[in-house]
Amino acid sequence: MFDPRRVPAVSATEANQRLEAAGGAEATHRPILVDVREPHEFVKVRAEGAALLPLSTFILRHVELPQDRAILMICNSGARSAQTTAFLLANGWTDVTNVAGGTIAWLQAGLPARHGPLEPGEGDLTA
């Protein structure tokens, strides 16, 4: 069993660097940034490019996440995403990393973010 306090973690800046470094790669080789906050939180502010998979539906929908891609998990502060990181690692995913400090740290670092209503397809796991 994985302890949520001891899951692999990176800073928001490092997570963004990983995403940017893979920017030109085929979609199936790029890391996916998964936000586990609830929709009302996600619509207010989100890391640019994040896909939404709310914690409230995570147990039912986690199987939608690819097991052959790097996954970066994010939430508001890093607590919920640490729990989901631990869950995925305990259930067969091998390349899952928590974004320490979550969206709060992302914004404090001045990293790309979106605010307000979603564009069509924005936040979809398949986008």
What role is predicted for each listed range?
Residues M1-I32, P39-A70, A79-A127:
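Rhodanese-like catalytic fold shared by cysteine-dependent sulfurtransferases
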Residues I74:
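Short, surface-exposed ligand- or partner-binding patches at beta-edge/loop junctions that are enriched
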